[in-house]
Structures are given as C-alpha cells and as structure tokens.
Amino acid sequence: MTLRGSAAWKQVGSIAQLPLGKSTNQHKNNHAVRSLSQQPCSSDRLKSPWLLSVRGVSAEAEGMRSLYETIMSERDKKMAENKELLLSVMETSPTRRGAKKWLKDFAPALGRKWQPRGISTAGPLPQADTRALEDNLPQVAIVKLREPQSIDETTLKGVGRTLCQLQMLGLLSIVVVDCDQDLVKGDALWPVIMKQTERALAGATIAPLARPRVMDYVMGIRPGSEGDQASSLAAGGVFVSREEPLIRALKDDAIVVVPTYAVSTDTCAARTVQADEVVVALTRYYSGLQFPNKSSGGPADTCQQPTAKPKAGIRKVMIIDPLGGPPANNRPEGAHVFLNMIQEYDTAMKYIKEADYPELKIASSAIGSTSDTSAHIRKKHADNLELTKRIVTLLPSSASVVITTPEEAANLRGEKGEESHNFGFLAQTRTRKPKNALIHNLITDRPAFSSSLPTTRFAASKPQAVKTGTMGNMDWTSKPIVTQSRTTLAKRGMPLTILPDPFTSPWTPTAPGQPRLRLTDICVDLPRLVHLIDDSFDRKLDVQDYLNRVEDSLAGIIIVGEYEGGAILTWEAPNPHNIPAAEAYAEAYRQGRLVPYLDKFAVLKRAQGEGGIADIVFNAMIRTCFPKGVCWRSRKDNPVNKWYAERSRGFRKLDDSNWSMFWTTEWDDHSNADYEDVCRKIQPSWADNKQIVD
C-alpha cells in the first residue's frame, strides 16, 4: 500500500510503460536500450537514475517487511504475556468474596490505568466503584530484592515480568535493591549497587507499560544516626528527602527502583544504608507516618503529628530472597506457609536460631566455611522476620508481607534444573506451571496453599521419584525434582487463646470427679461464644442442654481474636452397652479409651475465608491441643466436608445415619470402633429440635 504511493514506484511504472509509447519515441527508446546493452557494463552505468529507483523500491520493501515482522513479533509476545497473565489470574480460583474484595480495592486504579485517551464518540463508560479503601489512593507494593548478584538473567527477567503483571492488575511496585552489605563491603559495595540497580531496572523493562525508573538520591539520613537503634516505627534515621520524583512516578503508574544509599542532611554526602531501613522509611512515607521536622531537616516523631495523610495504599510488602521464607519445623526443607505474627513470631524466631541448614547453599562466594554459612542464613532469616514484624506493626491489619524466592516470584519453580530429552511427542507433554505466588496472593489475599494442610497434601512438595528406562536407543534417568514451596505469607493476625494453656500443662483427660474447665467459668465469654456458634451454623443453640451435655467431658476451647473463630473439644466415652454416661466416662478413663473429639468448629460468617482463621483454629487443635489425633463428624451433605477430608488421615460415611466421620489419628480398628460409637450416639443440642433429621 505504501509502496504504490511512493515516488519510486511511480517512476518505475513510467519506465515500464515506455515501450507502449508512439512509434518515434519507441524507436528512440529501443535504440537507447540497444545501445546501452551493447556497451560494456560499469559501475557508473549501474548508477543510472531508473536503476537507483528500482533499488530504492527494494530497500523500502525490505524495510517495510522488517518493520512488519517486528510488529508481528511484538504482537505475538504481547499476546503470550497476556495469555500467561490471564492463566495466572484464572488459576487463583478466588472465592466470590475474595473476587469482590479485589475488585473493590483495585478496580478504581485499573479504571485510571486503562482510561481511553483522546476523543471518543462512544457513550460514557460505566463508572467503577470508587469507594476503595484510603480514599481511592494508588495501591503500591514495596519489594525488597535481596542479593540480586546471585540471580541469573532469566530469573531476574521473570521477576520483572511478574512485577509488570502486578502493575497491570493495579499494584505498583517500589523495588529496593539489597546487595547484602554482609557479603559485599567497603569500596567494592558502590559498583555492585550501581550494577545491580541497572540489572533490576532492565528486568523491569520487559513490558512497555512498566516505564521503570531509578530514583537515586531520594533518601536522606539524619546527622549522627549511624549508630541509632531502629525501632519498629523508626527507620534508623533514614527518611524520604525528595518527594516529588516518587509522587510523579505514582501519577505515571511507573515501577520505581530505589538503590540503598542516602544523602546526609548535614554534609550532603551519600553513603550506603541498610535495605531494611529503606523499606521501613518508604513504608512510613507512603503511609503518611513521616512528618517534616523543620529544626533538624529530618522527619519528626510520629507522636508529635497525629494527623496522617497517606500518599498511597500499601497493600503488600514483598521480600524476594534466595533463601525464601523462614523455615518451619513441621515442613522439612520448607518454609512457613502462613505466619500469624501476633501468635507465632516468638516461636518462629526461636526455631530460626535453633534450626540446622545443611541443605541450603549461598550463591555468593563471599562466605567460606559451613559454620559461617549457617550463621549467615540464620541472620538473614532473622532479619527478614524482624523486618516483617516492623512492617505489620506500621500497616493496617489488612496488609501483608510475602517472603519468597526469586524462582517462585518469577514463576520458574519446577522448570529450572529439569533435564530436557527429545522424546518426540512425549517431549511436548508438559506439566502445568505452579501458581504464581505473588499474583495468587494479590487476588485472593491468601497463600497458594492452606497452612493447615498436611505436608503430604502439598501438590508442590511431592518430589518426583527417580525413574529409569529405555526409549528408542537412549537410556534415560529422571532425577528427583524437589519443588517444595518456600513462600511465606505473614500478617499481623489475631491473638490465639487456648484454655487450658497446653504450654503449661498438655491436655490430658480429667479424672472423674476432679475439677475441670467449664464453659460457665469467668475466663470464658459465654454470650460471645454462643453468638459465634449461632452465626456460624446459622442455627440457634440450646444453651442449657449443651452446657449439661459437655459439663463433665469438656477438654478445652480455642478462641481466635475477639471470638471471630473457635473450637470446643471434649473427651468422649464410647458406650457400646448404653450404660449411664458417668459410668461410661469412668470406665473409659480407667481403660484409657476416652476419645479426643471436636465438638464445635465455628467461624463468623463475615470472617469466613479471610485472615486464615479456620487454619489458625485447626492448626492449634491438631498441633498443640491434640497432637496425637482427634476425630469429629459432619453431615454428609455439608459443603465443608471436602475441606475436612483434605486435612484428615481418613474419613468414612456412617451407614444408616446422616453423618460422615473424620479422624487424624493412625488407623486402628479398635480406636476407630470407639470413634464410630461416639459419632453415632452424640445428640445435637439445637433449639429448633430438628436434630431428628441427622
């Protein structure tokens, strides 16, 4: 189309029409052509105007073809990226409640991002719900990228692609480059910071809409704060000194890369600072907790300025670390799936300091001996956990911290390290990628896996067995591929109350006639507990009948938060001969046959699916209260049965009843007979008197 309208094309067309002219002109032109053909060819002859025109057409056509191929290549690349993003979003499988929450928080930001530019003759677009949290502020995530010098180019670009996908979903990233000053020190640190900042910038440039930019010299540091001890609210003297570039980047929907150095307010000299202090300073700034101090040039104490004006809504803080999340004692070679910081911080920190790390390797060559390596790993895990505590203290309870590895952030886990063999058709048969942990968490506000799932149920944690075989003339061996996830989601969480305290005295059956916990004790808020049960089951509890039933069998209760969730557990006596309940309990106690039983498991409707309350209750029950096992029952048509089945060792439907029985103990015919007897004979205590249906 363009070539036909060009001057070169018209000139070639006129030359091609010369033989069709008048006879006189035809004779002259033929003579000219004959004369030209009879003369020896030379470079000067080849430079005739019409030949140059033909060559111009060829060059222009080649340029257009190259441009077309480039455009098509970019289009295919863009379509592939959009497809990958769409699949990542669809694989999250959010609940209706989670999807509505994500749309409420991020739809206004997406509406601004994709607002059409220029004049449009179409009708007005439907208005998105602008009643987002924090007055419709832009939503940002502060990302700490630790030790980028140990991350290869493919993984770094994958991390950049994920950050660009988060940007497309409405979450801007502020990337803090942490070159790990414990590994690189002295004069060698500055060039490493510069180089790794450039690599992080290049990795984030993978998508055109990312528009990443480096924000150097935006951080300041108070004079004389080199030895300051940073608290949970302070940032060790580091603060945002230049706001305008950061605000402009927010308006431009740009990804920001921040190197870890700050300018002293008294000497104007730049010096390196700890990345954790930069993360805390940025968190305070965007949250509106940094206030100007005219006397010192730095930020004032937050208690002097109670009014806060946030610049953005910080939804997530992400720590991308080659080590991944903090190790968990119940997941060998794996990390905590979910951390309820109020409840689990102390125990997690204690395990970090006591655990051995023989399987982990540091990519940096700066560490030599094994003891130094273990100490370094402990320190980095402890630093990440301490930073997480400081962040969740600053931010609202809805915010969270995600700690993951570069491979999982890039969604490359399971791909690297696998040998590729050309087996024809079989070579094209691939397993599906695991869920992108960061995208899944953004949409669902949950970890990729439930923290209450047994370790063997983690799909990503099942190593493939070593296989050997022959295909064609080739012998092959597939090495075991360990794809255990090392991603941790941490939130401020809720306090956990267990009565009686199992850390003081483990739960054991109470002897007949001895004092025991009762639901009417002053330590139990019975009205709140009854409301929790009524709301969760959507039925009214017959309170007095229930109190009478569990009066002599109560083992303990678990309460999360302000009675947002909880469980009531009992010691039940099997009674195959239908003797009086007191006699059955005494006999079972003497024989050691009392059954640990989950009597009530409840979560408020408004809290169901949020904050991992059900996981917190279930974990407390099976790991702390009844570590040797527990059983319970549920109606056969209960939609929660799938959730129960995934967390139990076994289940069975009881014949001639409407109950399914679940247990977490080892299989034993004798014990399971007792379990079945208990599950069949316990009478429900509902005020509607509809228990006959069960």
From Swiss-Prot:
EC number(s) on file: 2.3.1.1
Entry similarity comment: Belongs to the acetyltransferase family.
A Gene Ontology BP annotation from the UniProt entry: ornithine biosynthetic process
Described function: N-acetylglutamate synthase involved in arginine biosynthesis.
UniProt domain N-acetyltransferase: residue ranges: 513-687
PROSITE patterns associated with the record: GNAT_NAGS
Protein name, per record: Amino-acid acetyltransferase, mitochondrial
Organism: Pyricularia oryzae (strain 70-15 / ATCC MYA-4617 / FGSC 8958)
Gene that encodes the chain: ARG2
Record-level GO cellular component terms: mitochondrial matrix
Pathway where this protein functions: Amino-acid biosynthesis; L-arginine biosynthesis; N(2)-acetyl-L-ornithine from L-glutamate: step 1/4
Spans annotated as Disordered: 20-44
Location of this chain's protein in the cell: Mitochondrion
First and last residues of the transit peptide: 1-56
One Pfam family, short name: NAT
Highest taxon listed in the record's lineage: Eukaryota
Molecular function as annotated in GO: L-glutamate N-acetyltransferase activity
Uppermost EC category: transferase
